[in-house]
Curated annotation (Swiss-Prot):
The gene is THY1. GO terms for cellular component: dendrite; external side of plasma membrane; growth cone; membrane raft; plasma membrane. One of its GO terms (biological process) is cytoskeleton organization. The modification Phosphoserine is found at S82. A lipid is attached at C130 (GPI-anchor amidated cysteine). SUPFAM superfamilies: Immunoglobulin. Glycans are attached at N42, N79, N119, N139. It comes from Macaca mulatta (Rhesus macaque). Keywords: Cell membrane, Disulfide bond, Glycoprotein, GPI-anchor, Immunoglobulin domain, Lipoprotein, Membrane, Phosphoprotein, Pyrrolidone carboxylic acid, Signal. Residues 131-161 form a propeptide. InterPro entries: Ig-like_dom, Ig-like_dom_sf, Ig-like_fold, Ig_V-set, Immunoglobulin_dom, THY1. May play a role in cell-cell or cell-ligand interactions during synaptogenesis and other events in the brain. Residues 20-126 form the Ig-like V-type domain. This is Thy-1 membrane glycoprotein.
Length: 161
């Protein structure tokens, strides 16, 4: 009986590990706020446990999540939204003091080691504005529709001068 329980538990852990995966982590600037987009897969029925953190000078600072306890200095500066396969964290009043390696990690439950994570190194002078990223990454269907519409208008000779 113990062998059957062990095998069932192992299969459950493997299924959750395979079904929950961070696919990308991007950073950009919205006004004076840092925006982190953590895209992930979730093909299991298990709830996603997650954590956003910043590593600066080898020290990890938890910003937001369901796993670690966010540090007091970041609590009032963070704003979080979640969609089906994306978690978005905003860090307001972003300055050069907030530069470092940001991590989005998925966990099984509690304080277990992450099953999947992605890092992005953020330097204030190297950050791009979010508008360009969101147009290409999130609104690809509108861009394709625009290109198809222009081709259709050109084919019907609507745009000829």
């Amino acid at each position: 009986m113990n062998l059957a329980i062990s095998i069932a538990l192992l299969l459950t852990v493997l299924q959750v590990s395979r079904g929950q995966k961070v696919t990308s982590l991007t950073a950009c600037l919205v006004d004076q706020s840092l925006r982190l987009d953590c895209r992930h897969e979730n093909t299991t029925s298990s709830p996603i446990q997650y954590e956003f953190s910043l590593t600066r000078e080898t020290k990890k600072h938890v910003l937001f999540g369901t796993v670690g306890v966010p540090e007091h200095t970041y609590r009032s500066r963070t704003n979080f939204t979640s969609k089906y396969n994306m978690k978005v964290l905003y860090l307001s009043a972003f300055t050069x003091k907030d530069e470092g390696t940001y991590t989005c990690x998925l966990h099984h439950s509690g304080h277990s080691p992450p099953i999947s994570s992605q890092n992005v190194t953020v330097l204030r002078d190297k950050l791009v504005k979010c508008e360009g990223i969101s147009l290409l990454a999130q609104n690809t269907s509108w861009l394709x529709l625009l290109l198809l519409s222009l081709s259709l208008l050109q084919a019907t000779d609507f745009m000829s001068l």
